[in-house]
Amino acid sequence: IADNKGACEVYPAPFAVFLNQDDKTYVEPDVTVVCDADRLDDKGCNGAPDWIVEIVSPGSYRMDYLIKLFKYRTAGVKEYWIVNPVKETVQTYFFEGNEDSMQYSFEDEIPVSIYSGFSIRISALLA
């Protein structure tokens, strides 16, 4: 993102995201990307970040694929990725416009929908 002169900031876990802006209920995604600095304070992100990435584990399938998917979509998150290290796949959701869901392998160049012209190949990050 920085290489492309982007204004977005990346925050790895632990990083609190207060989806309801209530200072009580929050989630801690594995990776959070915030493009609006006004949403940030000393506690974390207030309101929906632009992009969330969750790394699924065997015990978190229901949480990541159902519960968090619903929470993030209804809260206004623009893009949500679920990374499955066992299957070496990434399920992407773009909640603006057509709300498409796509599945990619770790070897694919995965387009970042919120950031035109930017893509990520997971295998390159793990090398």
State each model region's role:
Residues 1-5:
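Short helix-capping segments at alpha-helix termini
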Residues 7-75, 82-127:
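C-terminal interaction segment
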